[in-house]
């Protein structure tokens, strides 16, 4: 490049370097998209904009990608490294004419015809300044937004720091030439496909236009379902039709979001400033699969686990910075207080009551509103657990909103709905102290401005945050496989509840919970908490803690829980150093070395973080517990023990394996434990290795409290086979509370009502107990004897004496 173009670009780059601060999506394009910089690369942009080209150039140079302004020389031919699909307002006449893109594509393809070794990588790139979707009134949504010079100047001046450069996966021109030819018609098709690609990408980043709120309400009021519900309201409450309609409008006002792009931009600035000071990093994994879904036109429903009120903001922030539209979020009505409520509403929150029972008008309005969001193409987010987990484990799913999602499909919408499970993890949850109090019986404090300010005042170093996108679940595919006749239930007016709906929703919900756990994230805090809580005195020397973390890390890396789970790349020593900076542990020095201590007052709180990854370590912990107690055990006997206890573990922790997969899982874990030197294998028997017995015992402790809890329930069931389910739950909790006091068990979930309720339901499903309360004494006693061998004698005596004393 020489002469006037060089001078022009240098002059144009001066204001851009000041006004524009763009972000690359993905963060590492060459690595994440598999670009080979040793092979020729050319860039395709949607429309002629030198500002876009220079913004792209800055990102290319920052990520060691070829400079788009440097032409490509191929077989003596000199070609521009960039192609504009659309023409546009130009300053100099020699710039790309309208059909130049087709000519350049043809030139590139023609070079491949004469050179079989040539393979140019064509990389589509979108550069966006601002992402306001606009309102529905007036103009139609343009497929591509071309701005003239004046408009572009103002866009860059106002939105230059809210810009991103989106790199798409490359297209091999060699493959295009081999499979489709190199003539001009193929070049025209390539330009047309690129144009469609950019239009879809813009829609994925900006979203559909927003309706005027009153227009949305008018449309909802005109729906037959709400009109019928209004008539029923007037008749049942003996009020006028106008009054019933006002009630419906009041409910819409209570529920509906009031999305504002300017509020999103402002909040993004505030959160960007806040995150950088509170978090040491936010780790995002598998976002590309969601970007692809959005690009392919899917209606996306984000289904994250719920750890903290921070989840709402963190996920929207992450999605925004991944080039996606922040979703409309179903938030509890308890958050609709001033000033949080109006702010959340403008950030996309729509509010939902805890229960719909007894209010047909409310349930109809909410269902129609949710259906309208889907039909308009807005992404939606809701927490299938229904509330924040107080224990750090996933809660049993609440299926109401999920059921309404499937009912929205039964209205005959054309866009495919896909559920995206998301694991959110933290190294510090600001509400964890409150959770512990609530589990001990304290009344939940109502959300309010003073409570919010108190919470914000306590925010300090929050460590790392984790957002892992799990395996998406296309609802249409799921229904086609499991309910082939589902289309017979489509009704565009009525909310249909076919016989298959409830069992299918329950099955989908359980599958979602498994997929959320599949995307679990191990980190310094939850690994250190797991190890220290496994120690009887909540303390280990630094060498012991390092050895234990190495054990956990090797298990998770060499026998991964799932392909979607993540394990830190740092060493055990680096993780310990990071965890100590969080000020949750104490380090004492003696003449021999460092001792890492988990203070008593912190122990209860730290169980929350341990529980975040309990599912990722429960299988090796269970195997270690069985081997430790038996000292030596055959491979077959080990499998029998695991298979007997697995149904309870699977239901409680939403584990991923089916029963027939257990044999291979046990083999893989046993091989890894043997490699680590924790056990030895002799004549198909697994033996403890005395040299590493402490590490094995600490690993086994991860299953200790779970096995004790199961022992309580199975002993009660054995002692009284005719006990009914509610009494079994109640008495199990009573014994668990006594056990926690007498044996210093600091885990609040040890006697959590929900845990025992889930356990008793699983016992019913597995045939240990019937709905009438009749148990099979021989079977329950057999399992109890197995469990009794895996717990200490003093705990066993406490369990048995507690029931005898009654």
From Swiss-Prot:
It comes from the Bacteria. Pathway: Phospholipid metabolism; CDP-diacylglycerol biosynthesis; CDP-diacylglycerol from sn-glycerol 3-phosphate: step 1/3. One of its GO terms (cellular component) is plasma membrane. A motif (HXXXXD motif) lies at residues 305-310. GO terms for molecular function: glycerol-3-phosphate O-acyltransferase activity. It is an enzyme of class 2 (transferase). It catalyses: sn-glycerol 3-phosphate + an acyl-CoA = a 1-acyl-sn-glycero-3-phosphate + CoA. Its EC number is 2.3.1.15. Transmembrane segments: none annotated. Keywords: Acyltransferase, Cell inner membrane, Cell membrane, Lipid biosynthesis, Lipid metabolism, Membrane, Phospholipid biosynthesis, Phospholipid metabolism, Transferase. It is found in: Cell inner membrane. Pfam families: Acyltransferase, GPAT_C. InterPro entries: GPAT/DHAPAT (IPR022284), GPAT/DHAPAT_C (IPR045520), GPAT/DHAPAT_LPLAT (IPR041728), GPAT_PlsB (IPR028354), Plipid/glycerol_acylTrfase (IPR002123). Its main location: membrane. One of its GO terms (biological process) is CDP-diacylglycerol biosynthetic process. Coiled coil: none annotated. It is a peripheral membrane protein. HAMAP family: Glyc3P_acyltrans. The HXXXXD motif is essential for acyltransferase activity and may constitute the binding site for the phosphate moiety of the glycerol-3-phosphate. Belongs to the GPAT/DAPAT family. This is Glycerol-3-phosphate acyltransferase. The gene is plsB.
């Amino acid at each position: 490049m020489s002469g006037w173009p060089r001078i022009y670009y240098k002059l144009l780059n001066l204001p851009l370097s000041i006004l524009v601060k763009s972000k690359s999506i993905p963060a590492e394009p060459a690595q994440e998209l598999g670009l080979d910089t040793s092979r020729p690369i050319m860039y395709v942009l949607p429309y002629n904009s030198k500002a876009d080209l220079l913004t792209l150039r800055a990102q290319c140079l920052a990520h060691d990608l070829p400079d788009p302004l440097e032409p490509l020389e191929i077989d003596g031919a000199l070609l521009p490294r960039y192609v504009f699909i659309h023409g546009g307002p130009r300053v100099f006449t020699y710039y790309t004419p309208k059909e130049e893109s087709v000519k350049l594509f043809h030139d590139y393809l023609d070079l491949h015809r004469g050179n079989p070794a040539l393979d140019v990588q064509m990389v589509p790139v979108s550069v966006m300044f601002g992402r306001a979707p606009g309102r529905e009134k007036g103009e139609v949504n343009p497929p591509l937004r071309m701005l003239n010079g004046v408009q572009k100047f103002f866009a860059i001046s106002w939105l230059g720091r809210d810009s991103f450069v989106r790199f798409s996966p490359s297209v091999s021109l060699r493959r295009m030439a081999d499979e489709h030819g190199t003539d001009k018609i193929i070049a025209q098709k390539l330009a047309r496909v690129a144009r469609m690609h950019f239009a879809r990408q813009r829609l994925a980043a900006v979203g559909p236009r927003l309706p005027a709120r009153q227009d949305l309400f008018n449309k909802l009021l005109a729906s037959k379902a709400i009109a019928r519900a209004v008539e029923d309201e007037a008749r049942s409450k003996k009020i006028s039709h106008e009054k019933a309609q006002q009630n419906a409008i009041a409910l819409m006002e209570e529920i509906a979001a009031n999305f504002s792009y300017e509020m999103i931009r402002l909040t993004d600035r505030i959160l960007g400033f806040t995150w950088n000071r509170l978090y040491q990093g936010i780790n995002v994994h598998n976002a590309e699969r969601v970007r692809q879904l959005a690009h392919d036109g899917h209606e996306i429903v984000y289904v994250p686990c719920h750890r903290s009120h921070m989840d709402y903001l963190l996920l929207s922030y992450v999605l925004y910075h991944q080039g996606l539209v922040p979703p409309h979020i179903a938030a509890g009505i308890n958050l609709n207080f001033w000033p949080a409520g109006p702010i959340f509403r403008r950030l996309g929150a729509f509010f939902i009551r805890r229960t719909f029972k007894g209010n047909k008008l409310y349930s109809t309005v909410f269902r129609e509103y949710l259906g309208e969001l889907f039909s308009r193409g807005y992404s939606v987010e809701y927490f299938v657990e229904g509330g924040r987990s107080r224990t750090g484990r996933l809660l049993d799913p609440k299926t109401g909103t999920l059921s309404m999602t499937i009912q929205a499909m039964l209205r005959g919408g054309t866009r495919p709905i896909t559920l995206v499970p998301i694991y959110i993890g933290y190294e510090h949850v600001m509400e964890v102290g409150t959770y512990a109090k609530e589990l001990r019986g304290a009344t939940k404090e109502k959300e309010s401005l003073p409570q919010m300010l108190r919470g914000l005042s306590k925010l300090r170093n929050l460590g790392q945050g984790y957002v892992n996108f799990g395996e998406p679940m296309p609802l249409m595919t799921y229904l086609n496989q499991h309910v082939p006749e589902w289309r017979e239930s489509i009704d565009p007016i009525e909310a249909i509840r076919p016989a298959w709906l409830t069992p299918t929703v329950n099955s989908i919900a359980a599958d979602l919970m498994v997929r959320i756990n599949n995307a679990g994230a191990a980190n310094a805090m939850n690994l250190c908490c797991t190890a220290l809580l496994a120690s009887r005195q909540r303390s280990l020397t630094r060498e012991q803690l390092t050895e234990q973390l190495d054990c956990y890390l090797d298990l998770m890396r060499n026998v991964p829980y799932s392909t979607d789970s993540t394990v830190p790349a740092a060493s055990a020593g680096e993780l310990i150093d990071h965890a100590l900076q969080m000020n949750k542990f104490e380090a004492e020095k003696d003449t021999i070395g460092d001792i890492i201590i988990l203070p008593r007052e912190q122990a209860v709180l730290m169980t929350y973080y341990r529980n975040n990854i309990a599912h990722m370590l429960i299988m090796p912990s269970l195997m270690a517990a069985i081997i430790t107690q038996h000292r030596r055990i055959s491979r077959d006997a080990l499998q029998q023990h695991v298979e007997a206890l697995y149904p309870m573990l699977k239901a409680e922790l939403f584990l991923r394996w089916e029963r027939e997969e257990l044999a291979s899982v046990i083999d893989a874990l046993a091989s890894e434990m043997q490699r680590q030197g924790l056990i030895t294998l002799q004549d198909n028997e697994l033996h403890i290795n005395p040299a590493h017995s402490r590490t094995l015992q600490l690993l086994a402790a991860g299953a200790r409290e779970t096995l004790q809890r199961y022992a309580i329930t199975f002993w009660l069931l054995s002692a009284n086979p005719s006990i009914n389910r509610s009494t079994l739950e109640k008495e199990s909790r009573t014994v668990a509370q006594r056990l926690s006091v007498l044996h210093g068990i600091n885990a609040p979930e040890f006697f959590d009502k929900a845990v025992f309720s889930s356990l008793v339901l699983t016992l019913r499903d597995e045939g240990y107990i019937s709905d009438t309360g009749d148990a099979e004494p021989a079977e329950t006693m057999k399992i109890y004897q197995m469990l009794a061998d895996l717990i200490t004698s003093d705990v066993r005596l406490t369990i048995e004496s507690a029931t005898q004393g009654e």
